[in-house]
Amino acid sequence: MELRTLRYHAIAVAILIFIFFIISTLASNLVVPTRYTIDKTAPMYLDYAYYIDETKTKTFDTIINQPELLTHQPFSDVPWSFSQQNYWLFLDLENKSLNKQNVVAHFDNPMVDHLTVYRLDKNNKLVETYKLGDKEEALSLFEYSVPHIRFLVERKSSQRLVIKIDTIGISKTPVNLYRDKEFIDL
């Protein structure tokens, strides 16, 4: 009788371990969306910089024409705070692939008031401006809840995204770049 009970307990433990393995595998794939960012799935090279405008007086032209103001550090090093200040994030993208890349920039803060994204070519000429944020009108429900932009990076070319974050409250806005397919799959 004890052997039979021991056998049932061993089978129950094996099933429990198998279930925990499946749950941990699924959870690790769902919890870490940065695993699928473009710098890990395509030959796209990224360079980061930022500037904190404590006076909220700097304009786009001022920031672009004074590159010495920038701090060249990853966005994870930005000293985010609740103070009334503008954050200017610079993201240089270089597509070293022989294929063009459809890119989605996801701004992971649905509570940001005003988020302006300037897309520049390699000569710092403005290509397009995007306005996102919960104070902006004429956005789709998806753009309100998941702030993002879509754009194309041609093969063997580079672009720059300049992101201005102007908000009251939580200003921390992680920026993740995905290929279009991976963004849809997430």
Language-model segments: which ranges?
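Bacterial N-terminal signal peptides
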Residues: 13-22
